């Protein structure tokens, strides 16, 4: 597999997983050898993917990444909220509407791909951005996207993201997928919300109840 192709594979290889490889067979004339030029790698079946996730979950749990005692406390009245999500689509619109209706608060949006090959890097950079931001820093970060297939949500199960969330100095709320979707991002975050709209309701008070 050529180095230039690796970033486009959308998969992190680990010992024990089964994959399907697509490519083309060529000959290496100087040594009379055949070689397979890898162009695409995908997981072989959802069952294999679930097995991989369960193994990863157990290993990270044993290392303490999901311990409740290590969760950071979220302010009851956050002055500003950082949002890592797609800058277009229903999710960000729902969040803005819910914040406006519930308890108007300053929002800082970090545009991110929430699916595909750029998703993981974008979200990690978003977390880093809010953590090093000195001016107008935020009190809490929401990572949000709508529902999707198991493969669509795989970036939110990556070990690199788990470690980045764990090390964040700012509390993080995971609002990934629908109510039945669970990711490793949910387990390591300081709070898990079943939906992006629910995340707002969980961290912001209702002004109608306060007045």
Residue ranges of model-derived segments:
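Short, conserved beta-strand segments within well-ordered enzyme catalytic domains
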Residues: 1, 20-22, 35-37
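Beta-strand/loop nucleic-acid-binding surfaces
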Residues: 1-12
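A short beta-strand motif that forms part of the nucleic acid-binding face
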Residues: 3, 38-40, 188
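Extended, charge-rich, solvent-exposed interface segments
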Residues: 10, 37-103
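OB-fold and OB-like beta-barrel modules that bind single-stranded nucleic acids
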Residues: 14-27
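Short, Lys/Arg- and Gly-enriched loop/turn segments at beta-strand edges
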Residues: 27-36
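Short glycine/threonine-rich loop/turn motifs
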Residues: 82-211
């Amino acid at each position: 597999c050529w180095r230039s192709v690796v970033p486009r594979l959308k998969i992190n290889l680990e010992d024990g997983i089964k994959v399907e490889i697509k490519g083309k067979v060529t000959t290496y004339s100087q040594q009379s050898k055949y070689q397979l030029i890898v162009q695409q790698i995908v997981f072989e079946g959802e069952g294999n993917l679930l097995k991989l996730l369960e193994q990863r979950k157990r290993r990270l749990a044993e290392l303490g990444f999901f311990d409740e005692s290590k969760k950071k406390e979220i302010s009851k009245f956050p002055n500003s909220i950082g949002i890592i999500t797609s800058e277009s689509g229903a999710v960000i619109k729902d969040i803005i509407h819910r914040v406006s209706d519930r308890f108007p608060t300053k929002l800082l949006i970090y545009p991110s791909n929430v699916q595909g090959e750029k998703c993981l890097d974008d979200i990690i950079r978003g977390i880093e951005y809010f953590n090093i931001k000195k001016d107008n820093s935020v009190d809490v970060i929401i990572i949000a996207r709508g529902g999707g297939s198991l493969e669509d949500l795989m970036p939110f199960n990556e070990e690199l993201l788990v470690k980045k969330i764990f090390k964040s100095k700012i509390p993080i709320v995971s609002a990934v997928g629908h109510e039945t979707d669970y990711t490793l991002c949910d387990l390591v975050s300081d709070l898990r919300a079943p939906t992006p709209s629910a995340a707002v309701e969980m961290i912001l008070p209702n002004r109608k109840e306060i007045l």
